[in-house]
A protein has these predicted regions:
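Short, structured surface patches at the beginning of a domain
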Residues: 1-135
Length: 135
């Protein structure tokens, strides 16, 4: 099963989501991985209420998939990737990250996570202020 995600409708409209899905499909074809499901999601990796992510979780829990292919860890979730991986493994589901070449230290991962959080909350804050000014 392929899971592709972008953060915004703008990224989806510019074709980023389709290109990501295509790269994942090509990877699966090259490695002879059968793909029964492709889930495309739009939303923040911090949001656990994403429709596609919840569909994926239901497929995992009901035993309908045995592999989940993602481009980067942060496409699945911004935080707690290893926790999600452990849960999926409990259901005999492997997560394959096709672009996992940037192994980083725990300190570097924490720094990236904090920067992601700041960017997310800053975007929400400034978006809210902008909306209030337009009213």
């Amino acid at each position: 099963m392929i899971y592709a995600r972008v953060s915004s409708q703008k990224q989806k409209m510019s074709g980023d989501l389709d290109r990501q899905s295509q790269r994942l499909s090509e990877y699966c074809a090259k490695h002879n991985l059968y793909v029964e499901h492709i889930i495309k999601d739009v939303g923040s990796g911090l949001n656990d209420k994403r429709i596609g992510f919840n569909q994926l979780t239901n497929l995992v829990i009901t035993g309908k998939v045995n592999k989940v292919i993602v481009e980067h860890k942060d496409r699945l979730t911004r935080f707690q990737f290893n926790f999600i991986k452990k849960i999926f493994e409990t259901f005999d589901v492997d997560i394959i990250v096709i672009d996992d070449k940037d192994e980083i230290s725990d300190a570097e991962e924490l720094t990236r996570d904090m920067m992601s959080l700041l960017a997310c909350f800053s975007g929400k804050y400034y978006g809210k202020r902008s909306l209030e000014r337009r009213r």
